[in-house]
Amino acid sequence: MAPQKDRKPKRSTWRFNLDLTHPVEDGIFDSGNFEQFLREKVKVNGKTGNLGNVVHIERFKNKITVVSEKQFSKRYLKYLTKKYLKKNNLRDWLRVVASDKETYELRYFQISQDEDESESED
């Protein structure tokens, strides 16, 4: 007889957060425009613009929360965020970093001044 597998109860909702604090405060990122982009681009059952009552996208100051009643991948949210950054030519300055299990954060790339100076001397 095969050993029984422990079955995890299925999650009823998926909740993910995007922290946009630093770029929004610096004025290079528009959270309202990004929220609209997500509403247009998120696919439900293979169709865009089909959020219905299944996926809810909420913006509170500098944070965007995506709540889904169907399975929703955190990786898909990262993909859409990177797509938005590329579309608005922000991909060279910002990166998407997971700060915890349910949260992504937009951070600036860390460029050290020492590397730039040593390259210019050569």
Swiss-Prot record:
Belongs to the eukaryotic ribosomal protein eL22 family. This is Ribosomal protein eL22-like. Keywords: Phosphoprotein, Ribonucleoprotein, Ribosomal protein. One of its GO terms (molecular function) is RNA binding. GO terms for cellular component: ribonucleoprotein complex; ribosome. It comes from Homo sapiens. Pfam families: Ribosomal_L22e (PF01776). One of its GO terms (biological process) is cytoplasmic translation.
